[in-house]
Each structure stands twice: as structure tokens, then as C-alpha cells.
From Swiss-Prot:
It comes from Trichodesmium erythraeum (strain IMS101). This is ATP synthase subunit beta. Its main location: membrane. One of its GO terms (cellular component) is proton-transporting ATP synthase complex. It catalyses: ATP + H2O + 4 H(+)(in) = ADP + phosphate + 5 H(+)(out).
């Protein structure tokens, strides 16, 4: 802890502007950029104040400008500041599983200290080119629409795009649940600038679904790192790196395949923009920081597969005003292997997960990677849905009866496909009342092939809604027929 630090380099606060603190050090003893500074003192009310800051600028005249990782309430000019001579470091290893940390690696779940001495600095180089694994392989998620139309790459980066309230966090929770159960893999969750209530709900739901076991933490499958909306921008800007550092240890030292969830990568950019303005940098397009591309690259390039293990990253991307050309989502796009775009139109129809089958893309959807059969089924599904989309204007003006026989068949099959792309989630059982379904890729393909071939043309549309495999569709259709 801070109290055990040797005070070899001590400065004092000269200025405080919100989360930005200026510190003066003795001549010739300036800390380096990204060094952690600690301030431990008592405020005027006699309460303990403990703040960690990160050096961002060297101002000249032996002064540095640092950004605080927690609230600066209670700090005053003249307080003593200790240079730790190292970057912020966080605990790593199996002892982190089942625990909740803040940006500087302190546990915030009231379960006592972390039982590990292993710590890693949050700033590191990306793996070298020669260490990277370049052979592509698909990561099965058990979610039909994802596995069929926009499959995820093992060790790749996936973006979950959507406006407010279309279900990004629910999909993330379902993926954590499915990966833990189907693959037995560990996950690291970075809560970047999202609602504290959601963080609390996520933790409780993970306990309910046995992803976290508070009685026996060694059985837990996920470590959580939170820097929520109420935290200063410094914490929100760095919490993604803290989570990534924990994931890197599982990849490089434990030699595991890890899932890294970042919810929400837009808040990481937003926090960087706030810090940039506080540091007095000239804003770039739409008021974002001029270093937007660099900051994003430093984070994203560390998320990759090496010959030892992989980090597969799933990042929720809030799209401001549903505008995909905004610099924040646009910069994120450049790094992604797959995009899962959530559509407000589908959500309003009650189709969940509200993944847009035409807008969602993946570099893995190639015959050489997924095989010809998978590729052909996926493209046939998309072309049927695309034709339905083109016909919707005609239907709205003239009605369904004015369409040709072939087009009416396309519409009927497209509506079944649209409904069959929905599926009940394990983590949403409380809301839907339907038991969750994990659908294997071969079952997904079998179902869509049967719809496309016309084998199921005589089944009613509602039989395809909110089910798992095609066998459940047939059973539901028989049940509906019996009730009619």
C-alpha cells in the first residue's frame, strides 16, 4: 500500500483544477510521464484523503500536471505528493477472479484484501509481430444470429453497436454466461463509464448464474474492473487499461484463452476528450481530442492472439444520436474483426437480440474460414431479408396481394427468418419467462436451410419466435395447432 512507499521523491501541490492537479518537485527530480503519484493526508475535517494521480504533462519550472484517478475533494495546495517512480499497477492472476476492482486495482467489494503479490503496470507495449497468431478460427457463442451471419474470431475484436436501450449490456451478460458454461473460459469485464446500478446488477446476476461464487472465489470465472459514470475522467480513461492488464496475464502467463468485455468503449473516448480539454489541448473534429486515434490504437493493439493464448474482446460501442459517422464509433470500426449492430427497429418489433442481420459484418464470413455450406446459408438468409426490405415500400403502398407469387413466398420466408433469429437468453429468463437457449452452429444452419428450402412453409410465423433450435419450432407449431 501507499504507506510502505519510500518517500524518495516528494513534491507539493501548487494548483488544483477539478480532477487536474499540478505538483512542484525538487530540481532534477521530475517524475516520468505515466508515473503514479500518491497523495495521503488528512483534510480540514480530519478525515483521511488518499488520491492516486497519473502524470500527463511536464510543464517546465519543475512542475508536472497529473490527472486524478478519484475525487479531489479535500485536497489543498501545499499537500505532500509522493512519486512512486512507476506506473499504476493492478493485481493479476487467479486471485482476481470473482472480485471487483477500481482503476488502481483496489478491491471495492468488501471481501477483504486480494490474496496475491503479483502486480502488473497498466501501460505496456503491444505484443511483437513475430509473437502473433495469424491462423483464423471461429469462436462459437450459442447465439444464432451471431454464429450464422457475423461469426466472432477467436482472439479478435468485436464491436456491439447500438444507441441507448437496445440491449448491448444484455448481450454482453449472455456471452459471459455462455462462454463460462460452454468453454469454461475466464473473462475480464471492464465497466467503463457506465451506470453504477448496472454494475451492481451485473455482479448480482453473475452470482445468481454461478459465474461468480462468493463462498469459493476460486470457482469464479470472471474478474470485474469498474470505473463508473460518477468517477472522474482520469479513472474512466484508464479503467479499460486496468482490465486489459488483468486479461494479458491470463493470456501470457496462464496461457489461456480469455474474453475481455469493455462496456462501453465510447465512454473511454469521452473520458479522453474530457482529460484532453482539461489539459488545454486544442480540440479536433466534433470536439474530440486530437490524440483520439493514438489513444484507441494503444488500447486496441494490445488485444490480440499470441502463440501462447488469446484475448477475444467484445466491446459495446454507444453510437451518439445513432450516427455511425461520429469520430468515436468511426475510429473504433477500424480495429474490429466483426461488428454486431443492434437495431432500434427490430427492438420495437420485440425481436431480441435486436441484431441487424444486414448491417452486422464479420471478416470471418468467408468460405475459406467457415466452409462453403455455412457461407451459402448465411448469404441466402441475407439476400432473402434484403429482398423483403426492398419489397416493404410496395407492400406499404399497394398491399401484400399486389405482389407476385414468388415475392409473396420471399416475404413469408423472410418473416419466419426474422423471427427465427430471435432467441431467449439465459440472463433474461427473469423478464421473458422462457428458459434460455444455447444453440449449436450445426442446429442453427439446419434450421435456416429448412426455412429457405420451403420445408416449413406451412408452419405459422409465431412458431418461429423466441425459440432455440428448429425442433422447438415444430413442437411449438403443433402446440399452437392443438390450441387453435
Amino acid at each position: 500500500m501507499v504507506s510502505t512507499l519510500e518517500k524518495t521523491n516528494v513534491g507539493s501541490i501548487t494548483q488544483i483544477i477539478g480532477p487536474v492537479v499540478d505538483v512542484k518537485f525538487p530540481s532534477g527530480n521530475l517524475p516520468e510521464i505515466y508515473n503514479a503519484l500518491t497523495i495521503t493526508a488528512k483534510n480540514e475535517a480530519g478525515q483521511d484523503v488518499s488520491v492516486t494521480c497519473e502524470v500527463q504533462q511536464l510543464l517546465g519550472d519543475n512542475q508536472v500536471r497529473a490527472v486524478a484517478m478519484s475525487a479531489t475533494d479535500g485536497l489543498v495546495r501545499g499537500m505532500e505528493v509522493v512519486d512512486t517512480r512507476a506506473a499504476i499497477s493492478v493485481p493479476v492472476g487467479n486471485a482476481t477472479l470473482g472480485r471487483i476492482f477500481n482503476v488502481v486495482g483496489e478491491p471495492v467489494d468488501e471481501l477483504g484484501p486480494v490474496g496475491t503479490e503479483d502486480k502488473s503496470p497498466i501501460h505496456r507495449e503491444a505484443p511483437k509481430l513475430v509473437d502473433l497468431e495469424t491462423q483464423p478460427s471461429v469462436f462459437e457463442t450459442g447465439i444464432k444470429v451471431v454464429d450464422l451471419l457475423a461469426p466472432y474470431r477467436r482472439g479478435g475484436k468485436i464491436g456491439l453497436f447500438g444507441g441507448a436501450g437496445v440491449g448491448k449490456t444484455v448481450i454482453i451478460m449472455e456471452l459471459i454466461n455462455n462462454i463460462a458454461k460452454a468453454h469454461g473460459g475466464v473473462s475480464v469485464f471492464g465497466g467503463v463509464g457506465e451506470r453504477t446500478r448496472e454494475g451492481n446488477d451485473l455482479y448480482n446476476e453473475m452470482i445468481e448464474s454461478k459465474v461468480i461464487n462468493p463462498e469459493n472465489l476460486s470457482e469464479s470465472k470472471v474478474a470485474l474492473v469498474y470505473g463508473q459514470m460518477n468517477e472522474p475522467p482520469g479513472a474512466r480513461m484508464r479503467v479499460g487499461l486496468s482490465a486489459l492488464t488483468m486479461a494479458e496475464y491470463f493470456r501470457d502467463v496462464s496461457k489461456q484463452d480469455v474474453l475481455l468485455f469493455i462496456d462501453n468503449i465510447f465512454r473511454f473516448v469521452q473520458a479522453g476528450s474530457e482529460v484532453s480539454a482539461l489539459l488545454g489541448r486544442m480540440p479536433s473534429a466534433v470536439g474530440y481530442q486530437p490524440t483520439l486515434g493514438t489513444e484507441m490504437g494503444e488500447l486496441q493493439e494490445r488485444i490480440t492472439s499470441t502463440k501462447e493464448g488469446s484475448i477475444t474482446s467484445i466491446q459495446a460501442v454507444y453510437v451518439p444520436a445513432d450516427d455511425l459517422t461520429d469520430p468515436a464509433p468511426a475510429t473504433t470500426f477500424a480495429h474490429l474483426d466483426a461488428t454486431t449492430v443492434l437495431s432500434r427497429g427490430l427492438a420495437s418489433k420485440g425481436i431480441y437480440p435486436a441484431v441487424d442481420p444486414l448491417d452486422s459484418t464479420s471478416t470471418m464470413l468467408q468460405p475459406s474460414v467457415v466452409g462453403k455450406e455455412h457461407y451459402d446459408v448465411a448469404r441466402a438468409v441475407q439476400s432473402t431479408l434484403q429482398r423483403y426490405k426492398e419489397l416493404q415500400d410496395i407492400i406499404a403502398i399497394l398491399g401484400l396481394d399486389e405482389l407476385s407469387e414468388d415475392d409473396r413466398l420471399v416475404v413469408a420466408r423472410a418473416r419466419k427468418i426474422e423471427r427465427f433469429l430471435s432467441q431467449p437468453f439465459f440472463v433474461a429468463e427473469v423478464f421473458t419467462g422462457s428458459p434460455g437457449q444455447y444453440v449449436k452452429l450445426e442446429d442453427t444452419m439446419k434450421g435456416f436451410k429448412m426455412i429457405l428450402s420451403g420445408e416449413l412453409d406451412d408452419l405459422p410465423e409465431q412458431a418461429f419466435y423466441m425459440v432455440g433450435g428448429i425442433d422447438q419450432v415444430i413442437a411449438k407449431a403443433e402446440k399452437l395447432k392443438a390450441e387453435a
